[in-house]
């Protein structure tokens, strides 16, 4: 049983019990959230496709923790002009655990 979900503008292939890091969710740690399902399939071969209009699939996930991603450095320089700018960025993330995939 697996599903393709969308959260934070990205798509993920998931199965029950899997942990993954997604863009920060507006939910407390330990809270259950329902994630948008694009496509799902179960062991019997039954599938649900959101684009075909069969919105019968639901994926439930639990927020494990909130964290920040790896730091990236942005450096700009103009040769021979003495122009240098450095900026850093760390993305806010949430780690979720897929608890259940239901079709129908």
Swiss-Prot record:
Belongs to the bacterial ribosomal protein bL21 family. This is Large ribosomal subunit protein bL21. The keyword Ion transport does not apply. Keywords: Ribonucleoprotein, Ribosomal protein, RNA-binding, rRNA-binding. It comes from the Bacteria. It comes from Elusimicrobium minutum (strain Pei191). This protein binds to 23S rRNA in the presence of protein L20. One of its GO terms (molecular function) is structural constituent of ribosome. GO terms for cellular component: cytoplasm; ribonucleoprotein complex; ribosome.
């Amino acid at each position: 049983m697996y599903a393709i979900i969308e959260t934070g503008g990205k798509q993920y292939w998931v199965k029950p019990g899997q942990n993954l890091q997604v863009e920060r969710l507006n939910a407390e740690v330990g809270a259950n959230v329902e994630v948008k399902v694009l496509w799902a399939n179960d062991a019997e071969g039954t599938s649900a496709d959101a684009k075909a209009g069969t919105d019968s699939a639901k994926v439930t996930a639990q927020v494990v923790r909130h964290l920040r991603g790896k730091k990236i450095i942005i450096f700009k320089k103009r040769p021979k002009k003495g122009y240098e700018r450095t900026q850093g960025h760390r993305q806010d993330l949430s780690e979720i655990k897929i608890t259940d995939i239901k079709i129908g």
